[in-house]
From Swiss-Prot:
Gene that encodes the chain: glgA
Family annotation (InterPro entries): Glyco_trans_1, GS/SS, Starch_synth_cat_dom
Protein name: Glycogen synthase
Positions contributing to ADP-alpha-D-glucose binding: K15
GO-annotated molecular function: alpha-1,4-glucan glucosyltransferase (ADP-glucose donor) activity; alpha-1,4-glucan glucosyltransferase (UDP-glucose donor) activity
Organism of this sequence: Trichodesmium erythraeum (strain IMS101)
GO biological process: glycogen biosynthetic process
Record PANTHER family: ALPHA AMYLASE DOMAIN-CONTAINING PROTEIN, GRANULE-BOUND STARCH SYNTHASE 1, CHLOROPLASTIC/AMYLOPLASTIC
Amino acid sequence: MRILFVSAEATPLAKVGGMADVVGALPKVLRKMGHDVRIFMPYYGFLGDKMEVPEEPIWEGTAMYQNFKIYETVLPKSDVPLYLFGHPAFWPRHIYYGDDEDWRFTLFANGAAEFCWNGWKPEIVHCNDWHTGMIPVWMHETPDIKTVFTIHNLAYQGPWRWYLERITWCPWYMEGHNTMAAAVQFADRVTTVSPTYASQIQTPAYGENLDGLMSFITGKLHGILNGIDMNFYNPANDRYIPQTYDVNTLEKRVDNKIALQEEVGFEVNKNSFLMGMVSRLVEQKGLDLMLQVLDRFMAYTDTQFILLGTGDRFYETQMWQIASRYPGRMSVQLLHNDALSRRIYAGTDAFLMPSRFEPCGISQLLAMRYGSIPIVRRTGGLVDTVSFYDPINNVGTGYSFDRYEPLDLLTAMVRAYEGFRFKDQWQELQKRGMRENFSWDKSAQGYIKMYKSMLGLPEE
């Protein structure tokens, strides 16, 4: 099958959220399975620092009265062909910025559609989030090209219809009041990144005002769990952590804890409970809940806590203020740093993820992969990936809570803090998480089955 992934992000070149990990990993697995899979993404101004891009384009076109160029290269450390959409709107050195994102990504989507019609013609265009949402609309009457639309986060729905009608060709038959709604209606298949999230977005609590539409298209809605690149994220050979280890040499992991404590200025003590969090600092990730319990938890325990991420200025400021009250025990790192995030996964005892909603979540998978015990709220993909820890029967992979309430989060954190004292059970809990198989191979089989059903191909 010929499949083109269209996305605003792709690891390791351009990443803000989990969408980048999906687009950077899934095509590689599908290609190894014998399919002609390629990626189409913007030519951001910073890409030249990360890879070599040919000076001459392979194709030129016009979209929304704008000329653009297509450059062909290869996704780093893979054999996946990569098409870069070249236009001055994407030359600034940030993925998302300013007030013209709606225009920039509508142009990008239009350029991708033009390339599919007149350049390299796939059998399936796999679109990702609102940035590519107009592609299924434009391709609705192209019978030999099918479209898949993956919802990574329903909260971000793109520009409204009146705006699209003003800036570009918007078919008269387009339905839906924004890009996300239109994509969901016109795509041949719609996927979300976990089975639980696929069910939740059909309810008012999680549907972001599209729950009725999601229920209406339930026949073509699929929840396929995300995976992780088990080779790219592997504590046995990760060059970004001080000490490599695996499930059979878990005793070596403490060296990473000590190194992390030294790096952020904590007291070096292997017996201290070290908790970490790598996240966007936004309400979705449970920051409002954390602000209600973190100060009290830090005051009544000797926990060490490191937070990595950026987001809303309010949450950044509040976290800084709490950290200032616990010098040497709490560190707030307001930046994007993949190397530091890996050291947090490899060095912390527990990983905090109290999300209000979570389509799938990658961080909890990486935490378990590296032996950090997740503390999560049971929502979306966190339900599908982290099983409740029962110390009596010694089963489960993490600490979890159901209600989005401060007391429930605090209880889960205290349970983890107390559980850390029982070293043998804690190590068994770590090993169970590290043995979990969240590779893309299993997820890829689900996508292949769906692709074949779209094209009328028999399942092998």
